């Protein structure tokens, strides 16, 4: 047997050249090799690293020594090597086994710090202790082979709460590492989680575990009525959030599709399914069951919901309370008068009173309730009382609008006999009974018309005052834009006025007018007077608007004149500059022409001089040639001998 392996080396069957070992038997001693004939080659373990494989018949003892379970206790100063050997002997059959023994890096660091006299060591001192006291690290102290285990020691120091870092007193020195006496025994929490609120997280997790245990003991099953798989986490299927105010009552569960980070799909690939867990209905999306009659809500849950609804109602802004009260009072008076007129005239069976008045903003919420009107209900429950439509606009009632005639048209014989019963769902008389007392209803409708005319007169009087005040505010307030008051939206009618006279009059006052409109006393024949007054007020407002437009036009004209003057001045300056530039260009061209003429004259003079020089030179050469010719000595020939 060899050290470090669980079985013998396999025997060789062939040599490096491919020859079988049995063929060499004749060469080695002339016989067969002992122990090599008839045996198959044995397999070798693939991994020869730590930890070594255990034997097949090994049984781990059930109980371990208590002294080996808690490794955070401080060791007394003494022989550290003996302490390590004792720990190795105690943990001989433990599940954690390393190349140097059965102790982890954290245990070794704990022994190293505990063996120091002052119970503190620096990082370099911990390295030295490892090399000196652990046999495995004795030959791994150099820089090449110590990078791995030194990195592991640094990680264990920073990630375990049992070790505490203390600043060194000296400058430029590494910090001290000490044992934390307040550390909890057992597996410590990683220090990386210290950035989170660990205490709050631990409390919340503990409460959630207790609640889950209580639900399991009571036999509460998850939302899907299926037993969870063993690999599923505790929080999956029972998602509780105790910190939420809605869930403080307990037992409020979310959808089973919601999962926390711990129960991700990456760790539960075997439980994935392409089919959705549950087809959620709109009621299930909010966590409430379908059967609303059997729902049970705790008191805390109900209080939380009431607080939420109260806060939401406070934030909503409705219309002005004073306007609501006035409209409600007017509506109640009209309803009482209508009821008195119908009951006194016809003697119909007692009907329930109509519903109270509601502002226009809340009519959409009451669409499913039956409405009461004189013109009959509209399909779908959208018909509202006629005075509500009149109260929606203040300006229409002051003019000759069709809104005022709706109530009168609704009291025709046909409408009374055909549309009274559907408005009141509690009483539905037959057509014969309606025909019998339809005449009586028509007799009593005359009183109703008189009362309604009086009410309309009062309303028109109030609306006239409001309308005039609005017109004055729009005209006199300079901060408001003129677009808010648009006469095109109102059916004014045929108004005749002399625009030129108005313009001349307002131009004389420079557009500064102080408008004071006296309120006329309204008699019983109010509709015609109101129409005349309204037309006059509208004409005055239109004249004021035209005056403002004329002032604007005059100011715009003055500004236009100034702009024209500035433009003319600019044009004159530009023309002067252009003339000056043209003069400069002409002067420059004249100078260039003079220079060119001078150059031409110089060239002509040079050419004449050169021709004279050439002529003189040729004459001189001719003279020289003549001189040479005549300066040669003449040859004197002697006379002949016969001349004496």
UniProtKB/Swiss-Prot annotation:
The modification Phosphoserine is found at residues 80, 195, 264, 267-268, 273. Residues 39-75, 187-210, 222-276, 329-386, 412-435, 578-612 are annotated as: Disordered. InterPro entries: Fork_head_dom, TF_fork_head_CS_2, WH-like_DNA-bd_sf, WH_DNA-bd_sf. GO terms for molecular function: DNA-binding transcription factor activity; DNA-binding transcription factor activity, RNA polymerase II-specific; RNA polymerase II cis-regulatory region sequence-specific DNA binding. Disulfide bonds: none annotated. Residues 350-359 have a biased composition (Pro residues). Keywords: Activator, Cell cycle, Cytoplasm, Developmental protein, Differentiation, DNA-binding, Growth regulation, Nucleus, Phosphoprotein, Transcription, Transcription regulation. This is Forkhead box protein O. It comes from Drosophila pseudoobscura pseudoobscura (Fruit fly).
